């Protein structure tokens, strides 16, 4: 049940709702105070602010008629809170998976992108306009690191027969979510594809025979 985090995994032969292809609803978490302050959050564990809570609740209202089979969330509190609020009242298992945690900014986490004296002059421009070649923060990750682990996460879903007809809610982050979506495009270097997703924006992906198609993009 949501709210009581369960470390479970469906195995081949377990029952899920049938009669549909695998469908993934990939959401970016709700707003936090650091989002509002334009700070690099990365893997710092920051809770949702009041606006983020309300936005997640509204998103849940908009998704109330969708029959989900399970929830997978980044282990960070802002992603788990978002999942719990969107899925409120449903008796669903929630799995946490570090492969969809946000990109780590290492020593730069907590820096404000508007007035930092620590961030290199071209870092933010690279981050937004050429993320695939963006420099790695000291002690942090590159986008290529996140592409690799989110691809591993995606492959573990499509290779599990128990999931082939499941509808799955995935609560993740801006960079990690876009890296996950890169699995469904030929050009994996164009990570943002037009922009950073807004808080609580949702992308819908349908997977059939191991091939994913983006049905709806935020």
Task: For each feature predicted by the language model, list its residue ranges.
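Short, Lys/Arg-enriched N-terminal segments with co-localized hydrophobic residues
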Residues: 7-21
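Acidic, low-complexity terminal tails and accessory targeting/binding regions
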Residues: 17-21, 59, 95-96, 103-117, ...
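Generic beta-sheet signal
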Residues: 24, 163-174
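Active-site-proximal alpha-helix that buttresses catalytic centers in soluble enzyme cores
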Residues: 31-90, 96
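Short beta-strand scaffold positions
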Residues: 73-74, 148, 171-172
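Phosphate-handling substructures
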Residues: 89-149, 206
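GST superfamily/GST-like fold recognition
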Residues: 174-178, 201
């Amino acid at each position: 049940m949501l709210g009581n985090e369960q470390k479970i995994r469906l195995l081949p032969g377990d029952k899920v709702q049938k009669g549909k292809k695998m469908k993934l609803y990939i959401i970016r978490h709700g707003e936090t105070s650091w989002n509002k302050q334009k700070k690099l959050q990365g893997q710092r564990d920051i809770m949702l602010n009041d606006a983020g809570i309300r936005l997640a609740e509204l998103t849940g209202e908009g998704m109330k008629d969708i029959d989900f089979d399970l929830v997978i969330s980044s282990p960070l509190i802002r992603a788990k809170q978002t999942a719990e609020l969107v899925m409120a009242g449903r008796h669903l298992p929630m799995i946490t998976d570090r492969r969809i945690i946000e990109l780590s900014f290492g020593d730069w986490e907590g820096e404000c992108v508007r007035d930092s004296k620590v961030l290199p002059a071209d870092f933010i421009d690279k981050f937004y306009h050429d993320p695939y070649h963006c420099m790695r923060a000291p002690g942090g990750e590159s986008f290529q690191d996140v592409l690799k682990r989110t691809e591993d996460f995606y492959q573990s879903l499509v290779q599990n027969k128990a999931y082939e007809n499941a509808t799955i809610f995935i609560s993740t982050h801006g960079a990690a979510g876009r890296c996950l979506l890169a699995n469904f495009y030929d050009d994996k270097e164009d990570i943002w594809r037009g922009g950073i997703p807004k808080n609580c924006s949702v992308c819908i992906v349908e997977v059939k025979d191991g091939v994913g198609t983006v049905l709806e993009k935020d």
